[in-house]
Structure formats: C-alpha cells, structure tokens
Amino acid sequence: MQTTKPNTKILVDGGDPKETERLKTLIGFVDGQTTNPSLISKNPVIQAQVASGHKLSLEQQTQEYKKIVQTISPLVGEAGVSIEVFSNLKTSAEQMFAQGQDMFTWIPNAYIKYPCTHEGLRAAKRSVEHGMRVNITLCFSQEQAAAVYAATKGTKEPAYVSPFVGRLDDRGENGMDLLKNIKQMYA
C-alpha cells in the first residue's frame, strides 16, 4: 500500500489546442502538455494547408509550431508545454541546442524536449547549464533514465523524463516495470 502521494502530473500529448481545451473541460485541469513536430503536423490548421496543396518550408513549419504552442501555453498548469526540437539521427547536439534556445523563448512555461540519444542528452545537459527546463523523450530503459539523471543533475528547474511505456508493451515488454524501476532509482 502506498503511503505517500507521488509527485505525478497529467500532461496531454498532442498538437491541437482544441483537444487540450476539451480535456481540460472534461477532467477539470491539465498540468501540462507535450508536443512534437509529428503531432503538430496533425493539427487541423496544418492539415488544411497541406490538403490545399500548400507545402510548408521548415521556417513555415517552425512558425506554425510556435503559434500553436503559444495558444496551448495559457491552457495548461505548472508543468508547462514541452516543445520537441526537430531532429533525426544525424542532428547534432549543437543543432538541437540552437533550436532549443529559440523555442525556449516562445512561451514562459516552455520545456525543451530532446530525444534520449547521445546527442539529445548532450543538448539537454547544455540546456540545463543555461537555465532551461527540459523533457527527455523516447526513454525505453532504466539505463537511459540514468543517463537523463546524469545529464540533468544539478538543475534548479524541474526536468522530465518521458518513458515510452506503451511502445514497450507493444513489443511484449512490461512498460510499467520501467516506471517502477525509474521511480525506485530516482527516489
């Protein structure tokens, strides 16, 4: 039996402010929200532009991302909005950090979301050293969670790790075991 309440937050994962509003109405609150370029691309405004044959440049995508995040920001609580950088396996820590610095200025409650890769962790460490709030995503193992802890150690701001429980479950692993192990390791 649990004797203390965990410091757990409810964060919406999406890119449509109207969905955030609906959920907030349904449950009465939303602590925060996570976004990423893929979720933003599914936003109805973006989808309408694409359906009309408009191809967005990276700069236009970034501007739309910023507008959407700025609309979501006042709808959520203290856990803020996690804004994921545009990245792939070839994106360097320096490139991610530069994006993160810009994105961190978009809203007052920004958390910059980096992938749990070697380069993503390097970017997160540098971000923390510059006083930025971070959320490390795509965490699939306790070893990765330990690397997140090492990269964010000493931060004065909250730092989040986003374990991918559902994907672990999809491949036949027990995702909840990862959560239990992370909680025990961080305790």
PLM region descriptions:
Residues 132:
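Conserved catalytic network of the ASCE P-loop NTPase/AAA+ motor domain
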Residues 5-22, 26-30, 35-129:
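Active-site beta->alpha loop and helix N-cap motifs at the rims of alpha/beta catalytic domains
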Residues 2-5, 104-105, 153-154, 187:
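Solvent-exposed alpha-helices and their adjacent loops that cap or buttress functional pockets
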Residues 118, 135-187:
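Catalytic alpha/beta core domains of metabolic enzymes, predominantly
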